[in-house]
Swiss-Prot record:
The keyword Manganese does not apply. Keywords: Amidation, Neuropeptide, Secreted. This is CAPA-Periviscerokinin-2. The modification Valine amide is found at V19. One of its GO terms (cellular component) is extracellular region. It comes from Karoophasma botterkloofense. Mediates visceral muscle contractile activity (myotropic activity). GO terms for biological process: neuropeptide signaling pathway. Belongs to the periviscerokinin family. It is found in: Secreted.
Length: 19
């Protein structure tokens, strides 16, 4: 339960959630 966002990695965007 928290904000959902994505991070840009060498292979592309990796979406993940964090509290």
């Amino acid at each position: 339960s928290g904000l959902q966002f994505a991070v840009l990695d060498g292979q592309g965007f990796i979406p993940f959630s964090r509290v």
